[in-house]
């Protein structure tokens, strides 16, 4: 009989078991991607509306919003594929992204500020009392 206590850890082999990635992880990544695309379609719709029914300033703003929407679509696609590959490789890294939403907010803020500045400057030039 062994003299070692029963509950004591003994140095032994580690058994390598394949870890299973739950399907809900892939679906969550896909839902996030579709949410980003939903936002970009709305932003692109705003750009098209400004382009069709706006004046010269509206066309400038439409271009800005359309470029922000297209950039966001590309960002969402790259992020989706990066996360999907990391999930397939069972990467342990963080999957959150602080840079993308921050840049999106910054570019939207710039587009809105440019729209306001052009609108105020254009209206002040045409409405002299």
UniProtKB/Swiss-Prot annotation:
It is a multi-pass membrane protein. PANTHER family: VACUOLAR TRANSPORTER CHAPERONE 1-RELATED, VACUOLAR TRANSPORTER CHAPERONE COMPLEX SUBUNIT 4-RELATED. InterPro entries: DUF202, VTC_Complex_Subunit. Present with 12074 molecules/cell in log phase SD medium. Accessory subunit of the vacuolar transporter chaperone (VTC) complex. The VTC complex acts as a vacuolar polyphosphate polymerase that catalyzes the synthesis of inorganic polyphosphate (polyP) via transfer of phosphate from ATP to a growing polyP chain, releasing ADP. VTC exposes its catalytic domain VTC4 to the cytosol, where the growing polyP chain winds through a tunnel-shaped pocket, integrating cytoplasmic polymer synthesis with polyP membrane translocation. It comes from the Eukaryota. The modification N-acetylserine is found at residue 2. It is found in: Vacuole membrane; Cytoplasm, Cell cortex; Endoplasmic reticulum membrane; Cytoplasmic vesicle, Autophagosome membrane. This is Vacuolar transporter chaperone complex subunit 1. Residues 2-32, 81-98 are cytoplasmic. Belongs to the VTC1 family. Induction: By low phosphate. GO terms for cellular component: autophagosome membrane; cell cortex; cytoplasmic vesicle; endoplasmic reticulum; endoplasmic reticulum membrane; fungal-type vacuole membrane; nuclear membrane; vacuolar membrane. It comes from Saccharomyces cerevisiae (strain ATCC 204508 / S288c) (Baker's yeast). Its main location: membrane. Keywords: Acetylation, Chaperone, Cytoplasm, Cytoplasmic vesicle, Endoplasmic reticulum, Membrane, Transmembrane, Transmembrane helix, Vacuole. GO terms for molecular function: mRNA binding.
């Amino acid at each position: 009989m062994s003299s070692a206590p029963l509950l004591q850890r003994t140095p032994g082999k580690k058994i390598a078991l394949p870890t299973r990635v739950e399907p809900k992880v892939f679906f969550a990544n896909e839902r996030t991607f579709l949410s980003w695309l939903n936002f970009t379609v709305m932003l692109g719709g705003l750009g098209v509306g400004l382009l069709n029914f706006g004046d010269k300033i509206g066309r400038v703003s439409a271009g800005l919003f359309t470029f922000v929407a297209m950039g966001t679509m590309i960002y969402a696609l790259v992020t989706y594929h990066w996360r999907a590959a990391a999930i397939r490789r069972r990467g342990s890294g963080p999957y959150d992204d602080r840079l993308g939403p921050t840049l999106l907010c910054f570019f939207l803020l710039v587009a809105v500020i440019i729209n306001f500045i052009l609108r105020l400057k254009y209206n002040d030039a045409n409405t002299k009392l």
